[in-house]
Amino acid sequence: MKIAIAQTEICFEEPEKNLRTAESWIEQAAQEGADAIFFPEMSFTGFSMHVEKVAAYVNPIRQTMCRLAAQEHIAIGYGWTSCKSGGKGENHYTILGKSGEVLSDYVKIHPFSYGGEERL
């Protein structure tokens, strides 16, 4: 199995820009024969104190990643943020199969808090 790691520069609160960057990484990884590509934590939403703002992109991100996985026939792992009730954010990591199906969606249960963000 050949695995690609995409250590990208994440643009905070700019999911569309991050998706465009990811698309080129995915295409390159597939062209070089990778079976899977993995992106960093919060790779498309970035860390944001405005989780409701980036949460609007959850479905477009998933649709784009599923399409790219199937189109390029490559498994993809990526991180994103959602907004749960009460306005608190959740840190997800999703893994898609080569056909674009969701294999796993992990929600971090012990998030790191450097600046006391959990109190917000």
Model-derived regions, located:
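Active-site catalytic loop in hydrolytic enzyme cores
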Residues: 67, 84-120
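Short amphipathic alpha-helical segment that frequently serves as the phosphate-/nucleotide-binding helix
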Residues: 15-23, 62, 68
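Extreme N-terminal starter segment of soluble prokaryotic enzymes
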Residues: 1-5
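Metal-dependent catalytic neighborhoods of phosphoester/phosphodiester hydrolases
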Residues: 42-59, 85-89
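A short, hydrophobic beta-strand-centered structural micro-motif
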Residues: 58-84
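Active-site beta-strand/loop signature of hydrolases that rely on acidic residues for catalysis
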Residues: 18, 26-52, 69, 76-77
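Short polar catalytic/cofactor-binding loops
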Residues: 7-12
